[in-house]
Amino acid sequence: MLSARTLIDRDGITLADVSCAHGAGRGEDEPARTSHGLVFVRRGCFVRTVGARTCVLDPTMAYGANPGEQERIDHPHDNGDDCTWLRLDAGLAAALYGGDPRLPARSLPTTPRVDLEHRRLLAAAGRGGSDEHALVERAIGLAAAVLERDAPARVASGRPATERARRAVVEQAREALAADPAQSLPELGRRLAVSPHHLSRVFRALTGATVSRHRMRLRVRAVLERLGGGERDLARLAADAGFADQAHLCRVVRAETGTTPSALREALA
């Protein structure tokens, strides 16, 4: 009656498309949850009960979930529901929510912007072929947007307080990525002792690019250098530069430069 399709599973994040075919009526007590996360309702309506707390959830809502919570889901109507599950490991949940990984286990209204971003993220992850670092960065931003509306002070805590501190964090992130572009946003956050959400936001504000876009640009510049040095094997170049495959390399290089690696190879060699 419940099916789930995992679309992202890396860097402390899982994004899954979850469908429930439960008919109208009272549900059964579910096993206790084992992880932190946010659930976004896309279709249907149900009533979630955890202990003495009950909330009605529909496509204008999300809710937080935590390890140890035992819930019961009741459906007032037939046809079940469709939801998106965004799991966060404890360290990432704590970094996003002011140091405490325990997320608000209640209904969390989603704005039209947040709902649309959530659906776009789900679609991009489901299509495949997307930069997984970019998907992770978007997922972190989505979680922060929902939590920030509920507890802005908690989400804001840990943000570099001064312009000088923000610039220092961005410079340190650029140094780290120049040494190893494969580092993920959560890894950078841990390395620099800053919330990945704040790092992403400050990085974009000061550079005009997301962390994932900057990472991809570093990889494209490395590709151009290799092409200028006479590299002929695009499959090998894609693997060395950190692209998923040759097709991924070609898409990104064309998006960044307006032309193909083959044409650039002839122009630069």
What are the language-model segments listed below?
Residues 115, 119, 136, 140, ...:
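Conserved terminal C-lobe alpha helix of the protein kinase catalytic domain
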Residues 122-129, 145-154, 172-187, 203-207, ...:
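Basic, amphipathic alpha-helical hairpins
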Residues 2-103:
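N-terminal regulatory/effector-sensing and dimerization cores
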Residues 97-159, 173:
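Amphipathic alpha-helical segments enriched in hydrophobic/aromatic residues interleaved with Lys/Arg
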